[in-house]
């Protein structure tokens, strides 16, 4: 009858291999790379609109992808508009036109009015 396969002995608690993975040579822990996302801002808006509602991490991931996608579309369209008009700067006018082109009907109107309100608030606070 064959003998059962023996597993490798478990590494000791203070082994050198475990130490090098978690810590650098000078004894400091490695800094985790920061992953940028819009989750803080999505959460703030959610609490403004529905204070008693939460959001799952999966839903937050979807919202983050959505915001990134819309941002890229608006930036791309605004860039094309600036290029067509032989301009090297994207201004609020290009952004506004890009939003009007990308978003349908009533949604575009609301987005433009909220954007105008935000720009006015920003310029008045300077």
Swiss-Prot record:
<dbReference type="InterPro" id="IPR055333">
    <property type="entry name" value="HISTONE_H2B_site"/>
</dbReference>
<feature type="modified residue" description="N6-(2-hydroxyisobutyryl)lysine; alternate">
    <location>
        <position position="21"/>
    </location>
</feature>
<feature type="modified residue" description="Phosphothreonine">
    <location>
        <position position="116"/>
    </location>
</feature>
<feature type="modified residue" description="N6-(2-hydroxyisobutyryl)lysine; alternate">
    <location>
        <position position="121"/>
    </location>
</feature>
<feature type="cross-link" description="Glycyl lysine isopeptide (Lys-Gly) (interchain with G-Cter in ubiquitin); alternate">
    <location>
        <position position="35"/>
    </location>
</feature>
<feature type="modified residue" description="N-acetylproline">
    <location>
        <position position="2"/>
    </location>
</feature>
<keyword id="KW-0597">Phosphoprotein</keyword>
<feature type="modified residue" description="N6-crotonyllysine; alternate">
    <location>
        <position position="17"/>
    </location>
</feature>
<feature type="modified residue" description="N6-glutaryllysine; alternate">
    <location>
        <position position="121"/>
    </location>
</feature>
<dbReference type="GO" id="GO:0046982">
    <property type="term" value="F:protein heterodimerization activity"/>
</dbReference>
<feature type="modified residue" description="N6-crotonyllysine; alternate">
    <location>
        <position position="6"/>
    </location>
</feature>
<feature type="cross-link" description="Glycyl lysine isopeptide (Lys-Gly) (interchain with G-Cter in SUMO2); alternate">
    <location>
        <position position="21"/>
    </location>
</feature>
<feature type="compositionally biased region" description="Low complexity">
    <location>
        <begin position="1"/>
        <end position="12"/>
    </location>
</feature>
<feature type="modified residue" description="N6-acetyllysine; alternate">
    <location>
        <position position="16"/>
    </location>
</feature>
<feature type="modified residue" description="N6-crotonyllysine; alternate">
    <location>
        <position position="21"/>
    </location>
</feature>
<feature type="modified residue" description="N6-lactoyllysine; alternate">
    <location>
        <position position="12"/>
    </location>
</feature>
<feature type="modified residue" description="Phosphoserine; by AMPK">
    <location>
        <position position="37"/>
    </location>
</feature>
<keyword id="KW-0544">Nucleosome core</keyword>
<keyword id="KW-0007">Acetylation</keyword>
<comment type="similarity">
    <text>Belongs to the histone H2B family.</text>
</comment>
<comment type="subunit">
    <text>The nucleosome is a histone octamer containing two molecules each of H2A, H2B, H3 and H4 assembled in one H3-H4 heterotetramer and two H2A-H2B heterodimers. The octamer wraps approximately 147 bp of DNA.</text>
</comment>
<feature type="modified residue" description="N6-acetyllysine; alternate">
    <location>
        <position position="17"/>
    </location>
</feature>
<feature type="modified residue" description="Phosphoserine; by STK4/MST1">
    <location>
        <position position="15"/>
    </location>
</feature>
<feature type="modified residue" description="N6-lactoyllysine; alternate">
    <location>
        <position position="16"/>
    </location>
</feature>
<feature type="cross-link" description="Glycyl lysine isopeptide (Lys-Gly) (interchain with G-Cter in ubiquitin); alternate">
    <location>
        <position position="121"/>
    </location>
</feature>
<feature type="modified residue" description="N6-crotonyllysine; alternate">
    <location>
        <position position="13"/>
    </location>
</feature>
<feature type="modified residue" description="N6-(beta-hydroxybutyryl)lysine; alternate">
    <location>
        <position position="109"/>
    </location>
</feature>
<feature type="modified residue" description="N6-glutaryllysine; alternate">
    <location>
        <position position="17"/>
    </location>
</feature>
<feature type="modified residue" description="N6-glutaryllysine; alternate">
    <location>
        <position position="109"/>
    </location>
</feature>
<feature type="modified residue" description="N6-(2-hydroxyisobutyryl)lysine; alternate">
    <location>
        <position position="44"/>
    </location>
</feature>
<keyword id="KW-0238">DNA-binding</keyword>
<feature type="modified residue" description="N6-lactoyllysine; alternate">
    <location>
        <position position="21"/>
    </location>
</feature>
<feature type="modified residue" description="N6-lactoyllysine; alternate">
    <location>
        <position position="24"/>
    </location>
</feature>
<keyword id="KW-1017">Isopeptide bond</keyword>
<feature type="modified residue" description="N6-glutaryllysine; alternate">
    <location>
        <position position="117"/>
    </location>
</feature>
<dbReference type="Pfam" id="PF00125">
    <property type="entry name" value="Histone"/>
</dbReference>
<dbReference type="GO" id="GO:0030527">
    <property type="term" value="F:structural constituent of chromatin"/>
</dbReference>
<feature type="modified residue" description="ADP-ribosyl glutamic acid">
    <location>
        <position position="3"/>
    </location>
</feature>
<feature type="modified residue" description="N6-glutaryllysine; alternate">
    <location>
        <position position="44"/>
    </location>
</feature>
<feature type="modified residue" description="N6-acetyllysine; alternate">
    <location>
        <position position="13"/>
    </location>
</feature>
<feature type="modified residue" description="N6-(beta-hydroxybutyryl)lysine; alternate">
    <location>
        <position position="35"/>
    </location>
</feature>
<feature type="modified residue" description="N6-glutaryllysine; alternate">
    <location>
        <position position="35"/>
    </location>
</feature>
């Amino acid at each position: 009858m064959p003998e059962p396969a023996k597993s490798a002995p478990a590494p000791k608690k203070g082994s050198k291999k475990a130490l090098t993975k978690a810590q650098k040579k000078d004894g400091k822990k490695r800094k985790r790379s920061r992953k940028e996302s819009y989750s803080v801002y999505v959460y703030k808006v959610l609490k403004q609109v529905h204070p008693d509602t939460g959001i799952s991490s999966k839903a937050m991931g979807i919202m983050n992808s959505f915001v990134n996608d819309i941002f890229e579309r608006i930036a791309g369209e605004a860039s094309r508009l600036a290029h067509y008009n032989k301009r090297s700067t994207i201004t609020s006018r290009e952004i506004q036109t890009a939003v009007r082109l990308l978003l349908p009907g009533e949604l575009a109107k609301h987005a433009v009015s909220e954007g105008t309100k935000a720009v006015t608030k920003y310029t008045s606070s300077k």
